[in-house]
Amino acid sequence: MSHRKFSAPRHGHMGFTPKKRSRTYRGRIKAFPKDDASKPIHLTAFLGYKAGMTHIVRDVDKPGSKVNKKEVVEAVSIIETPPMVIAGVTGYIDTPQGPRALTTIWAEHLSEEARRRFYSNWAKSKKKAFTKYAKKWQDEDGKKLIEADFAKLKKYCSSIRVIAHTQMKILRRRQKKAHLVEIQINGGTIEQKVDWAREHLEKQIQVDTVFSQDEMIDTIGVTKGHGFKGVTSRWHTKKLPRKTHKGLRKVACIGAWHPSRVAFTVARAGQKGFHHRTIINNKIYRIGKSALTEEGKNNGSTEFDLTQKTINPMGGFPRYGLVNQDYVMLRGAILGPKKRLITLRKSLITQTKRVAHEKINLKWIDTSSKTGHGRFQTTAEKRAFMGKLKRDFLAEAENKA
């Protein structure tokens, strides 16, 4: 046949339209897990930064599967999650139009990296954000107003959220402006939630107090951007035959004469990537402690691999660097490029599948160089294999001289 098929299924999913750029590169939490007063008080989300990927070896615990009790190699993503600081608390009341914020109470002391978020140009600003509000915590009249706000939260609100920010100073990135996010508190009564939030103002929250090993969570973020792309790259439509006039990577028919307009369902060129997406059911394989602490100095070791090493590959993660703070290891790939802010949220659904309850037992984590084909797992292993190099002999000669 010299012509194309007369009928063909449409290309591209309409569920993600319109394919436009996200308003911000921080993943927005549009829904929180359902609250249960019988459970202990806990936060439902956390912020992290995508560092890169590696692979692991583990034993599968899945009776009935062909790979049960066998070793498998799986790809994992590393999300660096330094401790977050609670800077405020806000309460929401139920209205016919949905939840509405009643009032917000900020902490007495806000760090400079958090106050930078409220300015577009910190260097040229007067840097007076929250200076007047902080005086409320110092005089008697201001304290009465704050106590009244806390009482108002306990009396009228149906849900309580804390305002937390990341710590860019300990992350050692070029950016100095912290990221702020509202995180809902679940569990307990409203009074207990308000008291918990008040006790934790200006205090750090660790990621292992929010999530646990083997838990299924959701990742929210913005995908990698590709700019303005053609219809074949954007919608994966079939290329036209070679002899087609005026181009092959196009849609030949974009609609009938009447109605005299192009339907929104027709594939067209435009923005590709930098879309806001939510990926559900990412399983946590490990929550590692900071490599700067005694507990986490060997956070890349396992029960079977006793090598003293951190999670960092040799030379660090390409285009990211070293992961020195707490981290979360997730199964598979995560959306977005390196250094992209990733919002981690507790799952909205009740997990009933067997894969969600499988216990993960890591046997080995790859820490070879991710630039090229890495051969060695640690610097000590490479030094033992290579022996003394020329620079070592030169250094010894200089020391003797």
UniProtKB/Swiss-Prot annotation:
<dbReference type="GO" id="GO:0022625">
    <property type="term" value="C:cytosolic large ribosomal subunit"/>
</dbReference>
<comment type="function">
    <text>The L3 protein is a component of the large subunit of cytoplasmic ribosomes.</text>
</comment>
<feature type="region of interest" description="Disordered">
    <location>
        <begin position="1"/>
        <end position="21"/>
    </location>
</feature>
<dbReference type="InterPro" id="IPR044892">
    <property type="entry name" value="Ribosomal_L3_dom_3_arc_sf"/>
</dbReference>
<dbReference type="GO" id="GO:0003735">
    <property type="term" value="F:structural constituent of ribosome"/>
</dbReference>
<dbReference type="InterPro" id="IPR000597">
    <property type="entry name" value="Ribosomal_uL3"/>
</dbReference>
<dbReference type="Pfam" id="PF00297">
    <property type="entry name" value="Ribosomal_L3"/>
</dbReference>
<protein>
    <recommendedName>
        <fullName>Large ribosomal subunit protein uL3</fullName>
    </recommendedName>
</protein>
<dbReference type="GO" id="GO:0006412">
    <property type="term" value="P:translation"/>
</dbReference>
<comment type="similarity">
    <text>Belongs to the universal ribosomal protein uL3 family.</text>
</comment>
<dbReference type="InterPro" id="IPR009000">
    <property type="entry name" value="Transl_B-barrel_sf"/>
</dbReference>
<keyword id="KW-0963">Cytoplasm</keyword>
<keyword id="KW-0689">Ribosomal protein</keyword>
<dbReference type="InterPro" id="IPR019926">
    <property type="entry name" value="Ribosomal_uL3_CS"/>
</dbReference>
<dbReference type="InterPro" id="IPR045077">
    <property type="entry name" value="L3_arc_euk"/>
</dbReference>
<keyword id="KW-0687">Ribonucleoprotein</keyword>
<dbReference type="GO" id="GO:0003723">
    <property type="term" value="F:RNA binding"/>
</dbReference>
